[in-house]
Amino acid sequence: SRDQVAAVRPALESSHAGRWWHALPDGRIQCDLCPRDCKLHEGQRGLCFVRKMESGRMVLTTYGRSSGFCIDPIEKKPLNHFYPGSSVFSFGTAGCNLACKFCQNWDISKSQDMDRLMDQASPEEIARVAAEGGSRSVAFTYNDPVIFAEYAMDVADACHERGVQTVAVTAGYIGEAARRAFFAKMDAANVDLKA
């Protein structure tokens, strides 16, 4: 319901420490989240636009911020053998590490207007709203959850504490170390291969 979706809007900090990166000898940092290996100067963002070098470290600028929340049938993800007939609490952020010309969510995935991410929610609030609203799962969707992996993984932990499953709808364009950590937290995934 709209009330459930509206219930997930607290104020959160604007950036969150990123996990997959390392410092380079020339003062830049390299993002190791996906195979693009973006090399960033202070204040610069990667191709995904949501991972940034800030104060000499990698930060995720969309942690706790969403392009919107929606309750969908699980078949819309599309998953037909994962709790068929159940509701899934779906959300995404902005940005993407791909640039598909055929993207159906380009207004979200390629948005550089972070202010349009009006819906804010902590991992615990997402899990609570999903559980209280009767959703069997939470889906990370609309844009690729790989780029907000830290947030998705924290949401997954909070969901699992409440018995709520998690679903990643992704292209799977992710580095090996991040891939192992990310998918270890997911209960189901739709890996949408891009061609």
Kindly give the residue locations of the regions a language model identified.
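Short, intrinsically disordered, charge-balanced linker/junction segments flanking boundaries
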Residues: 189-195
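Flexible, acidic/Gly-rich N-terminal and inter-domain linker regions that tether
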Residues: 1-86
